[in-house]
Amino acid sequence: MGLAGTKVKQRFGLDPRNTNWSNDTSRFGHQYLERMGWKPGKGLGLVEHATTSHVKVSIKDDNLGLGSKLAKKQKTDEFDSGECSGLDVFQRILGRLNGKEDQINKEIERKRKDNIINGKWGIQFIKGEVLQSTWDKEAKKLLDKGTTKKRKIDSVDSSEESTTSSDSKQHKKKKIKKDRKEKEEKKTEKENSEIKKKKKEKKEKKEKKEKKDKNEKKEKKDKNEKKEKKDKNEEKEKKEKKEKKEKKDKKDKKDKKDKKEKKEVKEVTRDSMLMPKEQLNQQIATRLSVRSKWIKQKRASVMDAKALNEIFMVTS
């Protein structure tokens, strides 16, 4: 590429292999495991010969199943050719020569079906099996190294005794199965009773809650109704008071008006006309003084009863 190529800088840290944390014995986890009896180089399971190295995380860049790469490295069966092609045909020829043609054909057919299924779903299924040497079928537990060795030695001696004790073993197995079944039934009954109890309690709680909510709603409704009724009554009383006040004000105004009118207007009769009236203190303007004088004279003549009698020629 030369100078025109892209520059790639590599930076190496203080711990490129990331081993400081594993070598550090002052960590809490390391100290805690040592207190429990663990030592560096030992496994963490029941089996001592398990993996003791650190687990490394690798990026998965394909759609294969878990463990498919390991299966390619290690042959799963005698017909697993890996990357070699045409080995199954060679195995057929060898099978015909050895007289195991049927067995080999079955194995090849099974392998062909597995390949078809794996190609269809895009997943490679790996069948897991348990080693017979580390697993006790009767007790269903992992065996230690000592017990496995003893079993191997005793298996030769106890081959003759196995025939006689087969009946007793079957009886024991039946008894164990029966006890297990009874335990499971008891467990299921207990679980069912607990579930029923929980359901009942839940139902009761729900009913109580619903009842409480109903009562609260009813009380709230009653309070609202009472409040509305009270507000309506208060409004009605206020309205009535207002109307009464308005009526009273109107009546008072009317009475005042009537009194005023009565004061101002009096009935005009013959006697009232003949009777002398009080002189009014009326301020008259200067320009109307002549007219007012003439009006006063005329009024004076009307007020005088004697003068009127003379005018109308009435003899008393």
Curated annotation (Swiss-Prot):
It comes from the Eukaryota. Residues 179-195, 210-240, 261-270 have a biased composition (Basic and acidic residues). GO terms for cellular component: nucleolus; nucleoplasm; small-subunit processome. Its main location: nucleus. It holds the Pfam family G-patch. GO terms for molecular function: enzyme activator activity; nucleic acid binding; telomerase inhibitor activity. Residues 25-71 form the G-patch domain. Residues 196-209, 241-260 have a biased composition (Basic residues). Residues 146-280 are annotated as: Disordered. InterPro entries: G_patch_dom, PINX1. GO terms for biological process: box C/D sno(s)RNA 3'-end processing; negative regulation of telomere maintenance via telomerase; rRNA processing. Keywords: Nucleus, Ribosome biogenesis, rRNA processing. It is found in: Nucleus, Nucleolus. Involved in rRNA-processing at A0, A1 and A2 sites and negatively regulates telomerase. Belongs to the PINX1 family. This is Protein PXR1. It comes from Debaryomyces hansenii (strain ATCC 36239 / CBS 767 / BCRC 21394 / JCM 1990 / NBRC 0083 / IGC 2968). The gene is PXR1.
